[in-house]
Amino acid sequence: MKATKTTYKKDPMGLTPSQIVNELNRFIVGQEKAKKAVAIALRNRCRRKRVEGNLRNEIVPKNILMIGSTGVGKTEIARRLAKLTNSPFYKIEATKFTEVGYVGRDVESIIRDLVEIAVNTEKTLAKTKVDIHAREKAIERILDSLVGKTSSSETREKFKEKILNGELDDKEIEISVADTTPVGGGSFEIPGMPGASMGVLNLGDMIGRALGSSKTKTKKMLVKDAMAIIIPEESEKLIDQEKIIQQAINLAENDGIVFIDEIDKIASTGSSGAKNAAISREGVQRDLLPLIEGTTVNTKYGPVKTDHILFIASGAFHIAKPSDLLPELQGRLPIRVELNSLTKDDMIKILLEPETSLIKQYSALIGTEDVRLEFAASAIEKIADYAITVNLEVEDIGARRLHTILENLLEDISFEASEMKGKKITIDDKFVENQLSKIITNLDLAKFVL
């Protein structure tokens, strides 16, 4: 059944689990068990916030381990969940990390990056609230440059109206703006600090704070360009930076979602090659343990507790098994969800049902050239059939196979669309067969093309 956007009755605790699943159904086909698991995890966060007393701090999120091959919806479920709740969301591959003491990224950088995302989110929200005031101040600064600070109110009002109407957009003015040139070099990490605990330090930031951040320079630019630069400057002055940082840390601690992909790649197996590599992978797992269980990570914004951050780990587990992870790490990912491989029916639904389905995307793209692109039901079935065939014969990459097939299928149309204005193109099963049958039947070629 096709999911549609629904207006829900206001709930003081936010969306209910069934409502969350309905929202995910708008974009993701199947995988009901995984959707149900993340919906419960999200609702439990809301429930925890309403628990009173010391018990609230004892209730920790039940972290999730998603098991399934690539392209079945693991990442998309987590990404849509974060977007649905406006939570800080950070996705990272487990293979990017090395254990503490080795060259490479340490796992604490996950929390530093999550907090950075939360700060940017809060800052953007705060700027929207002061946008009107900031715009007024920007106009006043431009008026000072245009007519001088001592000009009459009547003159200023006249020129202000012209600025608002866009009549002076292309007029060049000379105006003082903040000097954003980096001071004193770039960023570095302090060696010898446990896990580089303060994160990346920027010399420019440090020197700027020491000398004061009021350094400006005079530049010549058009009025419209000046507005684009000055409005953010004025917004920065109007917002309370300390308050934003406090809110961002609170948001990251209580609503943050961390998605760790390819966790199966750091699992140690008996046949996993060099002993040192296995030790290194195990080291990364051990470094992840305190982070997932709950610890305090020092960031440039202050200490951040990870006790109530929701961790979702995922992996295909083709070679390694979940039981190959360290027992302690398995215990910190108590909810296990297996995602099913996609069937032909799933592929058909993926092409048609989501609000942002691939068919709708390609039709919209070609439609910008005044060309109407339509897909017959027989074509959709044929595309799904080919996607399943190649996944079985070459390698199973799930729904991502549809992207490759559609690109090859519509290559000529995409190339020639600008010369086909006003035309209607119908894609049927014969068209699909003519375009793709040679590639599909030649598996050696399909490995490279599809």
From Swiss-Prot:
Which keywords appear in this protein's UniProt record, sorted alphabetically?
ATP-binding, Chaperone, Cytoplasm, Nucleotide-binding, Stress response
Protein location: Cytoplasm
Instruction: Specify which residues bind ATP according to the UniProt entry for this protein.
Output: 29, 71-76, 261, 328, 400
> A GO CC term?
HslUV protease complex
Instruction: Give the highest taxon in the source lineage.
Output: Bacteria
Q: Is Cell membrane a UniProt keyword of this protein?
A: no
SMART domains xrefs: AAA, ClpB_D2-small
Q: Which GO terms describe its biological process?
A: protein unfolding; proteolysis involved in protein catabolic process
Q: Looking at the Swiss-Prot or TrEMBL record, what is one Pfam family this protein matches?
A: MCM
GO MF term (any one): ATP binding
- InterPro entries referenced in this protein's UniProt entry, alphabetically: AAA+_ATPase, ATP-dep_Clp_protease_ClpX, ATPase_AAA_core, Clp_ATPase_C, HslU, MCM_dom, P-loop_NTPase
Protein's UniProt keywords contain Chaperone: yes
What residue ranges carry the coiled-coil annotation?
A: none
Subunit arrangement? A double ring-shaped homohexamer of HslV is capped on each side by a ring-shaped HslU homohexamer. The assembly of the HslU/HslV complex is dependent on binding of ATP.
Q: Could you tell me which NCBIfam families the record lists for this protein?
A: hslU, PRK05201.1
Q: What's the family?
A: Belongs to the ClpX chaperone family. HslU subfamily.
Known function: ATPase subunit of a proteasome-like degradation complex; this subunit has chaperone activity. The binding of ATP and its subsequent hydrolysis by HslU are essential for unfolding of protein substrates subsequently hydrolyzed by HslV. HslU recognizes the N-terminal part of its protein substrates and unfolds these before they are guided to HslV for hydrolysis.
Q: Which PANTHER family match?
A: ATP-DEPENDENT CLP PROTEASE ATP-BINDING SUBUNIT CLPX-LIKE, MITOCHONDRIAL-RELATED, ATP-DEPENDENT PROTEASE ATPASE SUBUNIT HSLU
HAMAP family in the record = HslU
Q: What is this protein called?
A: ATP-dependent protease ATPase subunit HslU
